[in-house]
Design a protein with these regions (language model features):
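Extended, composition-driven regions rather than compact fold-specific motifs
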Residues: 1-298
Length: 298
């Protein structure tokens, strides 16, 4: 018997657009099957398929081997697909929220988001509530009893960080948390629900290169090991040909747990500083290249 798929496709329609900041809009989607969707973590990843010109709904193959056949479609017949965070799910109401970063018409996702109107349709590849197995589509898995949390993210990972902070705020005894958050401009510093033990540092990028404010903040707040004592030898990852994705050991008992996500080149530089210069335990840090400047990862 074939294994049950942990993800399935959901056809949804845009119900409402909520402007969160100059660069961030929340799309509220609705669909008859959303009641069968589930989320397993505050940084739950999903895929969004966008219609090609002339399509009302993205045309994606069905069946067990749909993804292979989707990838085999000619470029002009393959609906664009991008990764997003499932921000909030109200399954009983048939609603799901996805936050979109707006960066002009440079890509199909932002272009769709800029022009989207209520009733416009997309497909979501999201965890199937009918499947008892885990989707494994999230990485926020801190060890029990961790005392310090470090969150490092650019605006593409801000929806995930918002969910993480909400989870921490709901705890009786939340850990001390430092969140370094790079955004396009000062107006993107949205209000987030966070525990009293959290410090949120907003880093407007302005004209700086992607990830530069984030790297500088990490270097300023987490100094290199004293006396030049370096961490373990660190292999380099070519972020132009490989996906930078390293998950922490959720069973490791240690004082610090870090979650780092954003532009892959910046995450690579932050990884180098935290592990090589600061000598932190790589088993306590999750590194994720959510995107790579000049390259499509999906």
């Amino acid at each position: 018997m074939a294994a049950q798929q942990t993800y399935r496709l959901f056809e949804v329609a845009l119900k409402e657009r909520r402007v969160l900041s100059p660069s961030l809009d929340r799309m509220v989607f609705t669909g008859a099957d959303v009641a069968r969707m589930k989320t397993e973590g505050p940084d739950q990843r999903i895929k969004v398929f966008f219609p090609l010109p002339g399509q009302r709904v993205p045309q994606v193959p069905s069946g067990a081997d749909w993804y292979r056949r989707y990838r085999a479609l000619p470029d002009d017949q393959r609906p664009p697909m991008r990764s997003y965070t499932l921000r909030q799910l109200r399954a009983e109401q048939g609603e799901v929220d996805v936050d979109f970063v707006l960066h002009g018409e440079t890509g199909p996702a932002s272009r769709w988001a800029i022009h989207a109107r209520p009733g416009d349709r997309v497909l979501l590849l999201a965890p199937d509530a009918d499947c008892a197995d885990s989707s494994e589509g999230w990485e926020w898995k801190p060890p029990v009893g961790v005392g310090q949390v470090l969150l490092v993210a650019d605006e593409t990972a801000l929806p995930a960080v918002a969910g993480i902070l909400e989870e921490l705020a709901a705890r009786v005894d939340p850990p001390r948390t430092l969140a370094l958050l790079e955004v396009a401009q000062a107006g993107d510093a949205v209000r987030l629900k966070a525990p009293a033990t959290a410090e949120l540092v907003w880093l407007p990028r302005g004209r700086a290169s992607y990830g530069q404010p984030l790297l500088q903040a990490v270097q300023a707040r987490l100094a290199a090991a004293p006396g030049g004592v370096a961490g373990e030898a660190l292999e380099e990852i070519d972020v132009d040909t490989q996906i930078l994705w390293e998950q922490a050991d959720s069973h490791l008992a240690g004082p610090l747990y870090a979650w780092v996500a954003g532009e892959a080149g910046a995450v690579m530089a932050i990884r180098r500083h935290l592990l090589r210069a600061c000598g932190l335990d790589r088993r306590a840090i999750t590194f994720m290249g959510y995107w790579r400047q000049g390259r499509v990862l999906d």
